[in-house]
Amino acid sequence: MFAYIKGTVEEKNNDSIIVEAGGIGYRIFTALSTINNMGQNGTTVKIYTHYYVREDIAVLYGFGTVEELTMFEMLLTVSGVGPKAAISMISTLSPSRFYLAVVSQDTKSLTKAPGIGMKMAQRIILDLKDKISKEQLTSSIPMTSPENNEVTGDSVLSEAVSALMVLGYGSAEASSTISGIYEKGISVEELVKKALKSL
């Protein structure tokens, strides 16, 4: 119904924000990390939205990036995963880390999200592992400076996994191999060379 809403932040709560656009105040439920990135009241923001309707419930969920929205909608296709669990996952893992966790069948990372137990993590992996493309593994990682080690590490991991997939290796095999030999500060080229030797 709404692709995004652009307006001013009027109120921030623990689980939602109110954005005024065209004289209408929209209550948008979102991850705490997104709320914290929205700036102070009066700030102009653009928030991507998903209009969730079930029986007598109609709720707007919002996201700071298209990648988070895509991740949310992908999670909703999993049996037993509702909006709250999906938001919990987004609050815990970035899209790139989530995709890597799924294709490498890393249940430990998935269960870090509040409300996601082992059975749910296994179901998420089973339902989504074949739906995640190599483009999704890399497209959600923002360009950043080397000082940001966490994001740079994500980028190296994802690019290395993508390179192995281009060479014909399966996503789960590539992710598992790369995760097992990754070292802080290693380049994509070095990581791929090491991976090819171990495969």
UniProtKB/Swiss-Prot annotation:
Q: Name one GO biological process term.
A: DNA recombination
Q: Which GO terms describe its cellular component?
A: cytoplasm; Holliday junction helicase complex; Holliday junction resolvase complex
Q: Where is this region: Domain II?
A: 65-143
Region: Domain III; residue ranges are 152-199
Record region (Flexible linker): 144-151
The coiled-coil segments of this chain are none
Q: Which InterPro entries match?
A: DNA_helicase_Holl-junc_RuvA_I, Hlx-hairpin-Hlx_DNA-bd_motif, NA-bd_OB-fold, RuvA, RuvA_2-like, RuvA_C, RuvA_C_sf
According to UniProt, the name of this protein is: Holliday junction branch migration complex subunit RuvA
Q: Which organism is it from?
A: Ruminiclostridium cellulolyticum (strain ATCC 35319 / DSM 5812 / JCM 6584 / H10)
